[in-house]
């Protein structure tokens, strides 16, 4: 497998409409104003179209392994602040700019919770500043990638069997 193209910013969009499309439009515009090569993963797995806009490549979807490699190599990751997304970022040992989906109480809570941790930057959907995020991201605490722990996984499986 060839190595992934190193993108400066990897942005991953998810969430319910209309906020998914609103964020798509906001990030498409903002990413075109930032120097470098970027990728915007639009969260549309059934859309066959990849679009290039200058240094921005907009893709409908990426396989998990490819997305993880792009995220590991990016200067900045931009995503929603859903629980699963945050856990994926922690597992990769990566910080990110997180943008809670407006009206999604869990994401707004998680954004507030993580705002001061040194792991994530938080911006509101109506106030995105990628330039400021790039500067701030360079000062975030570096975290180790969480490695797989087969003994722990086996113990949890056994515990689940005993409880189930």
Model-derived features with residue positions:
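C-terminal amphipathic helix plus adjacent low-complexity
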Residues: 131-164
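A donor-sugar binding/catalytic signature common to diverse glycosyltransferases
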Residues: 66-109
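Donor-nucleotide binding loops and adjacent catalytic segments primarily
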Residues: 1-76
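Structural motif corresponding to alpha-helix initiation and N-cap regions
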Residues: 21, 61-65, 83, 108, ...
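Short Gly/Pro-enriched loop/turn and capping motifs at secondary-structure junctions
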Residues: 18, 45-46, 83-85, 103-105, ...
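Anion (oxyanion) recognition and catalysis
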Residues: 32, 90, 115-116
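Short amphipathic alpha-helical segments
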Residues: 23-25, 51-53, 89-92, 109-111
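Nucleotide-sugar donor-binding patch of glycosyltransferase catalytic domains
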Residues: 95-140
